[in-house]
Amino acid sequence: MEFEEGLNGRADKNFSKMGKKSKKEKEKKPAVGIFGMFRYADWLDKLCMALGTLAAIIHGTLLPLLMLVFGYMTDSFTPSRDPHSDRAITNQSEINSTHTVSDTSLEEDMAMYAYYYTGIGAGVLIVAYIQVSLWCLAAGRQIHKIRQKFFHAIMNQEIGWFDVNDAGELNTRLTDDVSKINDGIGDKLGMFFQSITTFSAGFIIGFISGWKLTLVILAVSPLIGLSSAMWAKVLTSFTNKELQAYAKAGAVAEEVLAAIRTVIAFGGQKKELERYNKNLEEAKRVGIKKAITANISIGIAYLLVYASYALAFWYGTSLVLSNEYSIGQVLTVFFSILLGTFSIGHLAPNIEAFANARGAAYEIFKIIDNEPSIDSFSTKGHKPDSIMGNLEFKNVYFNYPSRSEVKILKGLNLKVKSGQTVALVGNSGCGKSTTVQLLQRLYDPIEGEVSIDGQDIRTINVRYLREIIGVVSQEPVLFATTIAENIRYGRENVTMDEIEKAVKEANAYDFIMKLPHKFDTLVGERGAQLSGGQKQRIAIARALVRNPKILLLDEATSALDTESEAVVQAALDKAREGRTTIVIAHRLSTVRNADVIAGFDGGVIVEQGNHEELMKEKGIYFKLVMTQTRGNEIEPGNNAYESQSDTGASELTSEESKSPLIRRSIRRSIHRRQDQERRLSSKEDVDEDVPMVSFWQILKLNISEWPYLVVGVLCAVINGCIQPVFAIVFSKIVGVFSRDDDHETKQRNCNLFSLLFLVMGMISFVTYFFQGFTFGKAGEILTKRLRYMVFKSMLRQDISWFDDHKNTTGSLTTRLASDASNVKGAMGSRLAVVTQNVANLGTGIILSLVLVYGWQLTLLLVVIIPLIVLGGIIEMKLLSGQALKDKKELEISGKIATEAIENFRTVVSLTREQKFETMYAQSLQIPYRNALKKAHVFGITFAFTQAMIYFSYAACFRFGAYLVARELMTFENVMLVFSAVVFGAMAAGNTSSFAPDYAKAKVSASHIIGIIEKIPEIDSYSTEGLKPNWLEGNVKFNGVKFNYPTRPNIPVLQGLSFEVKKGQTLRLVGSSGCGKSTVVQLLERFYNPMAGTVFLDGKEIKQLNVQCVRALGIVSQEPILFDCSIAENIAYGDNSRVVSHEEIVRAAREANIHQFIDSLPEKYNTRVGDKGTQLSGGQKQRIAIARALVRQPHILLLDEATSALDTESEKVVQEALDKAREGRTCVVIAHRLSTIQNADLIVVIQNGQVKEHGTHQQLLAQKGIYFSMVQAGAKRS
């Protein structure tokens, strides 16, 4: 018992730790530690980062070093500029005075300094490349590992973890959050170290050149550092909240897109948009707060920087006037400190990126670090050489982690001997399926023990345990690959002969061989291209190929028609020979031959025995048998006919939403799913479908925020102009010492110019705040609008768009997560910086040409600057191509991840976690290789643009000396041109670092514009068409031909004609996959017929408004519920109004679910879990029926509406449905003939055509296909 308690305690601790957190905890959520961000760096990554950091440090040192050279050079100029100056020349000036102040001497000196500049530029070219490329390489390698580790961690979690955590958020984290980590730990960190070194080196050189002045300037620096630190802290907190809101929005989007048919059928688009928008609104609100806080900090930083300039020049000029320093010294100190402090400004985007990365990494690393109590990857545990198959449940108590207050099993005791077949029977939700889940160790019991061959299963290796068990569940999940691959999921390394043998045993061989691609046919996402019966048979083949010791059949034949069921049941009977088998079935005809039948009630077994024994006891089993047989003269079980002439083609294409709703709507193409071909087709699709957009088209997306953008641009222009104005003031201060003014005049002028610096600081504070706030707000509004518009456009599309292999849930949620934020990346604060830098350079050039007689030097610099810009353009072009490749390749990995996460229970049962990991890892190979290439491209182009600045220094001062020597320019004007143009060019060079963001934005904007402008053939938002006040319910199909868009060559309906009058009940019968559910989809107007016409009340369905057409009630075979309360799920039946609680309760009573709901602690407020996983199949089905009834529809569509119900529930629900269809037109699809015979009209469909029609008695008299079906049913009973 100690062993059990330890395990259970650990499980409880885990769930409480990983479950719902309190509000307080969320608010105080910390970020990952600085060094913790690099936890996945190996020795090579560390070497790359170390060398990259060393290169960044050298790079950061070279610019302040340049200022040292600049100081010496200034003192070379000063004597030639002001030979009659009475200023005492000290320090560097004394050295320079030893030179002959002649034109030749000046030019020779300047040539030497030009060589220094060129040498420093060459050094920058090398170290800048090493810095950027190595940091990008290290980041690319670490991100590759993080993606794999994160996916591994998800695959390693236990089912209980998914019950209490929103799986929908995981895909957003895999894309958006990992991208943020990549952004934060790559080249921006290299630039961070570069800026820090520039800051440090600047101050060191400042101290060496003039410690007094440096100390004065340094007095302001702690305040600047403090504001940066506070900003980073606040930013991390806001980023966490923003990411959380976006993750919630992403979870909503994934849930909605996964259930798109349910959403469209019930007209839930508006409701889902509001739900999505609510989370976006929260993210926008946090984002705007973040922008305000951040930009107050930036404004304060700039105010402090300019205040330090004012102080520096005021004190510096005093030192020059008192003959303590030369002007060269003051400039060396000033520029060194200036560069140091400006480098703090450049830290801002890098700190922001790293803060964002730390916030994003917190949740990811938390999941990676979560140790599951049931570890499917563990190598620990016993692996017996042989398994006999004796099973025992000893006093087992259990409740689900997400609903701990609801007890499911209350002391279950059950023994199953080796080779025995035990059938579990009982009402829906009594704990039968829970028993099967405990045996697979998907959960551990709260108390008690489950053992195999006398050994507690908790001591057996988890993977080994699951590999000896074969499972076929009520709602089987197939993966979006070929039929053969789906069966291979059952057991790796299985041969083709074994696959064929398994499908023959499962009665699937014939329909597979009739398909064009046979075993290589793609089944679509979640098996969407197959009918329910076909999916079930492939799932059975998958279980059989496993050759399991223990077989668990949870309603394994529920979706099959009579003939298929008989053959498959025989196959299962054969398969369970020599195996221990547990069968759960509602149809008692399938359990009567079991060795032991166990009757469940209230979470315990109340009776055990074989059929005859239990019939004598007249207990639960007897009651169920009598309920089922009463009134079923024809047969007590399931019937529907499958003709031998049935073509596999028509079977398959009834992709029919047999299940229309759970299977999730989005299907993949018929191309093979070999990785290479898939990638190739993806790339071709990109080239065809993504027209590139211009900057103006991207800007147009933000045009509604033009007042914000105008103010933002205006502020950015002012900020850009401040730098050239600074150049004028700076040159004037230098000029003060060139003129022969008296001491008092010089001091007065210096005081005035110093005060101007303070004024510039105040202006900067205001303009930086408004620039950041306006662009930040516009960017957040844009992100919200784009996500909303894209999601709205997705929900507008018709079902055929979702059928396209490019539009799976995974790729759509990936696009939603990344596209809007990518566009914002080019439009928000980055656009502000670009505008500012362009204004900076433009104003500098204009001032130099117009106000200064230095056009020759300006022109030289104007020739050099395009080279810097050219580097940026080349960089952008190259990176744009890489961004497009990355985007598509990561969409492929997103599809794989989504499929694995959504179908996690199936993946775990099949022990195929490692298979999905391998597939995911393979899908990451191309993005990984692209990231490594991109590192070098970015490194080369960045190094070029940076080095060109130094080369421009060399050219500027060499040519400046030439002009000064020939008296064509004054030194003051050389300084003005140099400061205005070169610093502007430096800003332009920095702009090129935004090239990757702009490249990504262009690709994303093209996708966004493409989907927003796409108008579907069947427009769910259309207000056009006739809107009759009342639909009577007359339905007519006239010569309807149809095939699914994904398989244009395979006909489904081939001239279908029938008519059903108002208030009549039409029953569609026929073989699995003959086109019955296609009729339902055409009535819902999910598709338009290829030929022929569908009429509603005598009007062609296309002429009616699409929302009016969809005012139908629908209950499908595998209903999808949303992760919200039971009340909200029922109310979802009618989204055109607010459904009252009384109506919800009434609908629940009619569907025989009220009593169960009322027994729950939270009653109608109980959450049902993702896709209703917290409920049994029967409970889900009854809630789906209540959802349809609350709509009070004129036409009711029932596609196997009672197939998942147990006998007792089915009888009551069938009565409710019979009552519900009074006065309504009903179209019913059912396999059980007991539910068919009372229909007003029975239509037998074969090969997409009506073969027989009439009442039950008329069709029996014809002795045709229907008669054969009845005979088959009679034999079975």
Swiss-Prot record:
Description of activity control: Translocase activity is inhibited by verapamil and is sensitive to energy depletion. C1orf115 regulates drug efflux through modulation of ABCB1 localization and activity.
Annotated residues for binding of ATP 2: G1070, S1071, S1072, G1073, C1074, G1075, K1076, S1077
Annotated glycan sites: N91, N96
A single GO cellular-component term on record: apical plasma membrane
Composition bias, Polar residues: 640-652
UniProt subcellular location: Cell membrane; Apical cell membrane; Cytoplasm
Record bears the keyword Iron: no
Top-tier EC class: translocase
Residue numbers on the Extracellular membrane side: 66-115, 208-214, 316-329, 731-754, 854, 958-973
Positions that bind ATP 1: G426, N427, S428, G429, C430, G431, K432, S433
Subunit and partners: Interacts with PSMB5. Finds in a complex with ABCB1, TFPI2 and PPP2R3C; leading to the dephosphorylation of ABCB1.
Name of the featured protein: ATP-dependent translocase ABCB1
Gene source species: Rattus norvegicus (Rat)
Gene encoding the protein: Abcb1
